[in-house]
Amino acid sequence: MKEDKVLILRTCANNMADHGGIIWPLSGIVECKYWKPVKGFENGLTGLIWGKGSDSPLSLHADARWVVAEVDADECIAIETHGWIKFPRAEVLHVGTKTSAMQFILHHRADYVACTEMQAGPGSPDVTSEVKVGNRSLPVTDDIDATIESGSTQPTQTIEIATYGSTLSGTHQSQLIAGYGSTETAGDSSTLIAGYGSTGTAGADSTLVAGYGSTQTAGEESSQMAGYGSTQTGMKGSDLTAGYGSTGTAGDDSSLIAGYGSTQTAGEDSSLTAGYGSTQTAQKGSDLTAGYGSTGTAGADSSLIAGYGSTQTAGEESTQTAGYGSTQTAQKGSDLTAGYGSTGTAGDDSSLIAGYGSTQTAGEDSSLTAGYGSTQTAQKGSDLTAGYGSTGTAGADSSLIAGYGSTQTAGEESTQTAGYGSTQTAQKGSDLTAGYGSTGTAGDDSSLIAGYGSTQTAGEDSSLTAGYGSTQTAQKGSDLTAGYGSTSTAGYESSLIAGYGSTQTAGYGSTLTAGYGSTQTAQNESDLITGYGSTSTAGANSSLIAGYGSTQTASYNSVLTAGYGSTQTAREGSDLTAGYGSTGTAGSDSSIIAGYGSTQTASYHSSLTAGYGSTQTAREQSVLTTGYGSTSTAGADSSLIAGYGSTQTAGYNSILTAGYGSTQTAQEGSDLTAGYGSTSTAGADSSLIAGYGSTQTAGYNSILTAGYGSTQTAQEGSDLTSGYGSTSTAGADSSLIAGYGSTQTASYHSSLTAGYGSTQTAREQSVLTTGYGSTSTAGADSSLIAGYGSTQTAGYHSILTAGYGSTQTAQERSDLTTGYGSTSTAGADSSLIAGYGSTQTAGYNSILTAGYGSTQTAQENSDLTTGYGSTSTAGYDSSLIAGYGSTQTAGYNSILTAGYGSTQTAQENSDLTTGYGSTSTAGYESSLIAGYGSTQTASFKSTLMAGYGSSQTAREQSSLTAGYGSTSMAGYDSSLIAGYGSTQTAGYQSTLTAGYGSTQTAEHSSTLTAGYGSTATAGADSSLIAGYGSSLTSGIRSFLTAGYGSTLISGLRSVLTAGYGSSLISGRRSSLTAGYGSNQIASHRSSLIAGPESTQITGNRSMLIAGKGSSQTAGYRSTLISGADSVQMAGERGKLIAGADSTQTAGDRSKLLAGNNSYLTAGDRSKLTAGNDCILMAGDRSKLTAGINSILTAGCRSKLIGSNGSTLTAGENSVLIFRCWDGKRYTNVVAKTGKGGIEADMPYQMDEDNNIVNKPEE
């Protein structure tokens, strides 16, 4: 039991504010910051102790909040008002209605010890005595003790305040306040406040506040606040706050806050906050915060924060933070943070951080961090960090760090670190570190370190270290260290050390050491030491030592010693010694001695002697003598003599004679004669003649003739003729002719013809013809023709024709024709034709034709034709045609045709045709046709046709046809036709036809036809027809027809017909017909407005307004207004107003008003008013008023008023009033018909003396 506490009762405003502006909480502590222990209500909190005393300070408004709070008795001060005390702080225990608050005090007072003597402070009066004195007491609280003693309960109290047309249903202790037309239903102890037209349903202990037109459904203990037109549905304990037009659905104990037009769906224990127009969907325990226009979908216990326009999808227990326009998708337990425009996809328990515009895809337990514009893809357990614009792909449990613009691909359990712009590829368990712009490729468990711009490729368990720009390739278990710009290739378990710019190639178990710029190649277990810039090649178990810039090649068990810049090649057991810059090649057991700069090649048991700078090559038992700088190669038993600087190679029994500086190579029985500086190689029994500086290689029985500086290589039976500086290689029985500086390589039975500087390579039975500077490679039975500077590669049975500077690559049986500078790649049986600068890639059996600068990529059996600068990508069995600068992407079996600069993307079996600059996207089996600059997007089985600059979007099985500059959007099974510049939006199964510049919007199953510049909006199942410049708006199942420039608006099930320039507005179930220029307005029970000479026809309860010369027909309770010379007809209770020369006809209880020379007819109880020279006829109990010279006729009990010259006729008990004008004022002459009066049913007039007389018969 509480001994030092008391309960107080007080009221607050609906927003929980007290008279001093302090906001009281719904529960918990409230404190006054300006507390002063003086009497009076100011500078403190106040309340009625135990709920007994004066109720004058309490608010009795229906929306007041009744508060019960607990106060420390030692802090209380009694004030003058009976029962009221003042205190600095309190704890709110209950907030509800008056009844619920009193019930709370009654049920809990027993928990407190009543204080009989209580002082709040020095000089303060006795609180208890103050309570006992009091003025008047609360009626309810006066019975507290009696209620407790009797054990009775409080009666049910419901407060309902509503305006007309509303329906309120409240149960025990509920409060309902609503505007007109609202429907409110409340459970126990609930409070509902809503604007007009709203619908509220609340469970027990709920609070609902909403604007007009809103719909709220709340479980027990819920709180909802929403703007007009909103829809809120909440389960018990939920708290929803939303702007106008929003939709909120919440599970138990959820909190939703959203801007106008938003849509929120939340499971239990969720918290959602979003800007206007956003969409949020969350499972239980989620927390979502998003900007306007965003879309959030979250699993249980997730937290999402995103900027405007973003899209977030999260599994349970995920956290996402993203900038505007971003897209995030995550499985449970993930944490994503990304800048605007980014895309993040994460598996379970992953963490992603990325800058704007980045793309991240991660498996479970991954951590990705990337700068803007980067792309990261990782399997589970990976850790990636990369700069902007980088690309990272990682296997499970990998770690990647890279600078901007880098590309990383890693297997599982790998670690990669790279500078910007680098490329790294590694298998599992690898560790790569590289500078910017480097390329690293590593096998399992390898370690790579490289400077910027380097290239490293390593097998498993390798260790590579290289400076910038180096290239290293190693098998497993190798250790490579190289300076910048070096190239290293190593077999397993090798050790290589090289200076910068060196090249090393080693077999297993080798040790290579080289200076910078050197080249070393060694087989297993070799030991090579060379200076910088040297080249070494060694067999097994060899030892090579060479100075810088030397070249050494040794077989096993050889010993080579050479000065710097020398070249040595030796077989087993050889001993070579040469001066610097020399070249030595030795067979087994040979001995070679040469001066500096010499070249020697010897078979076994040979003896070579040469001056400095000479080259000698000899088979067994040969004797070679050459001058300085010469080169000699001899078969067995050969004898070679050459001048200084010459090169000779001879088979056995050969005779070689060469001038200084020449090179001769001959098989047995050959005879070679060459000028100075020439090179000749001949098969047996060959004859070679060459000018100075030429190079000739021939098989047996060959004839070679070459100009100075040329190179010729031929198999047996060949005939080669080439100009100076050319290179020719020919198979057997081939014929080659080439200009100066060309390179030709041909298999047997080939014929090659090439201009100067060209390169030709051909297999058997090929025919190649190319211009100067070209490169050609051909399979068997191929035919290639190419201009200067081109590159051609062809499989067998291919035909390639290319302009200068082009590149062609083709498999067997292909036919390629391209312009200069183009690039073509073709599969078997393909045909490619392309202009200059184009790029073509085709699968087998494809046909590609492209203009200059275009890019084409196609799978098998495709047919592509594009203009210059275009890009085409096609699946198999596709046909693409596009103008210059276009981009085409097609699935299999598609047909695409596009003008220049267009973009086309299509799934399989599609047919697209578009003009230049257009953009088309189509699902499978679609047909699209569009003019230049148009944009088309279609789902499957759709047909779209559009003029230039148009935009079309359609779902499946739609048919759209639109002129240039138009915009069309259609649901499935729709048909749209529109002129240029039009805008069309249609639901499914709709048919829209519109002229240029028109705007049409329709729900499903509608039919719209409109002229140019028109605007049409239709509900479902409607039919609209309009001329140009018209505006039509209709509800569902309406039929509207209008001429040009007209405006029609109708509700559901209406029929409107109007001429040009008309304006018709109608409610549901209306029928309006008007001529041109008319203005009709009709609602349900209709209202029409039309111009002159109009015809209006409407049903009951209608209002018609028309100009002169109009014809109006309406049912009962209608209002008709028209100009002069009109005809009006209405049913009972009609109101007719017309100008002069009009005819009005109406039923009973009608009111008719017309101008001069009019004819008015009405039923009983009617009122007729007309001008001069009119005829008025009415039934019983009617009132007729007319001007001069009129005829008034009515039934019994009627009142007739006429002026000078008028004739009045009425039935029994009627009143006739003649208004007589004497020049100064009117005088009324009154007569009654029937008993005591004049005779009824007789026509009366006034004579000159103002007497009532019978009208004489005419």
From Swiss-Prot:
Its main location: membrane. Residues 261-286, 311-334, 357-382, 407-430, 453-480 have a biased composition (Polar residues). Residues 260-287, 311-342, 356-383, 407-438, 452-480 are annotated as: Disordered. GO terms for cellular component: cell outer membrane. It is found in: Cell outer membrane. InterPro entries: Ice_nucleatn. Residues 162-1217 are annotated as: Octapeptide periodicity. GO terms for molecular function: ice binding. Coiled coil: none annotated. Keywords: Cell outer membrane, Ice nucleation, Membrane, Repeat. It comes from the Bacteria. Contains 126 imperfect repeats of a consensus octapeptide A-G-Y-G-S-T-X-T; further on a 16-residue and a regional 48-residue periodicity is superimposed. Belongs to the bacterial ice nucleation protein family. A structural model is suggested in which the ice nucleation protein displays a symmetry related to that of ice. Ice nucleation proteins enable bacteria to nucleate crystallization in supercooled water. This is Ice nucleation protein. It comes from Enterobacter agglomerans.
